[in-house]
């Protein structure tokens, strides 16, 4: 990092008890977030590997979800999954400079219109669309101010604390499922039974729900 107070940590790409990834983030990303928060880092930014319906788990571990997009000719709106937009607290249209400035304005207007047709994610906050330029720095100060306003609004309404409690329970259940799979994979007999049941499911000889009950019997 260029600044002494900054800390940048790439997530591991390996699979297994300490690795793996799902939803655009590594399995232990939330643990790292909690550790960094306890160490006094604020704010903490999480960058995902991309945008897609399956890459939204980051919204389940962060306070604010940003969707970063580029200017388009107006036909890319349909390409963004509705589920991703519904999770966004801020939608940022980058590259709002030079020859793309006008296109960025049109793209921002398109997404602002789409947001008005969606149910707000929070009682105390309506998602907004902002334009910015990483090249010139335009709009960055406004984004930072909006982030602060978002935090104040959700803390004041009590939604931030409630959201964090809900996230903790969600990640407990998710980690429990992964831990059970780790246990199954680590037991030779159970692992063999699991492979047999997977084959039966693939062949259509057994339904997934029946196979799951069988492995737990």
What does each model-found stretch correspond to?
Residues 131, 141-216:
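Long, well-ordered amphipathic alpha-helical subdomains in the mid-to-C-terminal portions
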Residues 11-13, 67-70, 92-95, 131-132:
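Conserved beta-strand segments of the P-loop GTPase G domain that flank and frequently precede/overlap
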Residues 17-19, 50-52, 71-75, 96-101, ...:
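Conserved nucleotide-binding/hydrolysis micro-motifs of P-loop NTPases
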Residues 29, 47, 84, 94, ...:
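Residue-level signature of catalytic and energy-coupling elements of molecular machines
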Residues 90, 96-153:
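Canonical P-loop GTPase G-domain recognition
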Residues 1-54, 61-68, 75-76:
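Nucleotide-state-sensitive switch-loop elements of NTP-binding domains
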Residues 67-79, 120, 124:
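Short, acidic/small-residue loops that bind anionic groups at enzyme active sites
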